[in-house]
């Protein structure tokens, strides 16, 4: 399966294929001339696949070094980025060379940020290995690192030269890590694809883990939602905000819990349920939709709430949300399954929203 992210200034393809990782050398050769490559990966993914990937790239004529960092959201910071910049410089990476992000969402965000800022920007590729990264963060060009104040506070919009998705690598994920990625899949269904919602209704996490043909289809449909929105609004000023359904409260939960304690897809699930509950009470979403969303997230092993629910800490995190404009936060609601809408909320109203 192939999708084309047809951006006027930087079009690229997303390849989705079981077993695609075994052909990585040919894929990279089709996009880049023989050059130096820095493979950026965390210790877990690098331990599983790194040596084979490097061997294939070297066999195809590339000179490769690997920058490895400790697994987890806590590594997505300026210190790790600086270490990566220095690593690239010591290897002699120039603007005609490239970086490959090989790992989950943390790796993709970090490596993309490093590539977009090293020497004011060099080429990079995305090879996502988590479900969250495959269906969401690897497409669209958002890169970033966290600060103490907020998730992804420092970042750029920089598109990759290509994305290679191999669903088979998901077999090495634990059940929590796999289900976490389904938070973003459910979000895609809610904002833009009712047929995907119906498919998720008919399946279960067990079905998906046992049938990778179904996983390939679900990844494709989710990526198509992301592709359409990105092509229409590359810089996140309009319809691309729809992709943030559940993220306003979700990012606040991640921040207050401490990065990594609540996984991103889990936080999105919590955020979708909580914002829907508020919007339903205010008549902005239809009666009963919150229960439908809650039922779906719980069916796929995701949380619908977070404790302790500290309104003051959550509100403080929300004030640093990237969707804030002055004292207004642009939240996303779902008027019906398969559609989305922007709802502007003041900070004061948001305080009320957070009260239980």
Swiss-Prot record:
It is found in: Cytoplasm. Its main location: cytoplasm. It is an enzyme of class 4 (lyase). Keywords: Amino-acid biosynthesis, Aromatic amino acid biosynthesis, Cobalt, Cytoplasm, Lyase, Metal-binding, NAD, Nucleotide-binding, Zinc. One of its GO terms (biological process) is aromatic amino acid family biosynthetic process. This is 3-dehydroquinate synthase. The keyword Amino-acid biosynthesis applies. Binds 1 divalent metal cation per subunit. Can use either Co(2+) or Zn(2+). Pathway: Metabolic intermediate biosynthesis; chorismate biosynthesis; chorismate from D-erythrose 4-phosphate and phosphoenolpyruvate: step 2/7. NAD(+) binds at residues 71-76, 105-109, 129-130, 142, 151. Catalyzes the conversion of 3-deoxy-D-arabino-heptulosonate 7-phosphate (DAHP) to dehydroquinate (DHQ). It comes from the Bacteria. It comes from Lactococcus lactis subsp. cremoris (strain SK11). Its cofactor is Co(2+); Zn(2+); NAD(+). GO terms for molecular function: 3-dehydroquinate synthase activity; metal ion binding; nucleotide binding.
């Amino acid at each position: 399966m192939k999708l084309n992210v047809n951006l006027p200034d930087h079009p690229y393809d997303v390849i989705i294929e079981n077993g695609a990782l075994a052909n990585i050398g040919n894929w990279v050769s089709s996009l880049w001339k023989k050059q130096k490559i820095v493979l950026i990966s965390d210790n877990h993914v690098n331990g599983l696949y790194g040596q084979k990937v490097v061997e294939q790239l070297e066999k195809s004529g590339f000179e490769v070094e690997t920058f490895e960092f400790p697994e987890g959201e806590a590594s997505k910071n300026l210190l790790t980025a600086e270490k990566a910049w220095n690593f690239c410089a010591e290897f002699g990476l120039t603007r005609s060379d490239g970086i490959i992000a090989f790992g989950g969402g943390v790796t993709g965000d970090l490596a993309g940020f490093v590539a977009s800022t090293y020497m004011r920007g060099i080429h990079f590729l995305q090879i996502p290995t988590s479900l969250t990264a495959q269906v969401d963060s690897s497409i669209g060009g958002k890169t970033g690192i966290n600060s103490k104040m907020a998730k992804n506070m420092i970042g750029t919009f920089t598109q990759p030269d290509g994305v290679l998705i191999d669903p088979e690598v998901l077999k090495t994920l634990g059940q929590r890590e796999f289900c976490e990625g389904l938070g973003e899949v459910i979000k895609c269904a809610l904002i833009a694809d009712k047929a995907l919602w119906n498919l998720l209704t008919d399946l279960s996490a067990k079905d998906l883990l046992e049938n990778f043909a179904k996983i390939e289809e679900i990844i494709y449909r989710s990526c198509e939602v992301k592709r359409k929105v990105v092509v229409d609004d590359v810089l996140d000023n309009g319809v691309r905000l729809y992709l943030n359904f559940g993220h306003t409260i979700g990012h606040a939960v991640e921040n207050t819990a401490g990065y990594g304690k609540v996984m991103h897809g889990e936080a999105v699930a919590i955020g979708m349920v909580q914002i829907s509950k508020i919007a339903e009470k205010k008549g902005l979403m239809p009666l009963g939709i919150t229960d439908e969303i809650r039922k779906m997230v719980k069916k796929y092993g995701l949380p619908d709430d977070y404790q302790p629910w500290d309104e003051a800490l959550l509100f403080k995190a929300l004030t640093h949300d990237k969707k804030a404009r002055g004292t207004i936060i642009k939240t996303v609601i779902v008027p019906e399954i398969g559609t989305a809408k922007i709802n502007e909320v003041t900070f004061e109203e948001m305080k009320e929203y957070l009260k239980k």
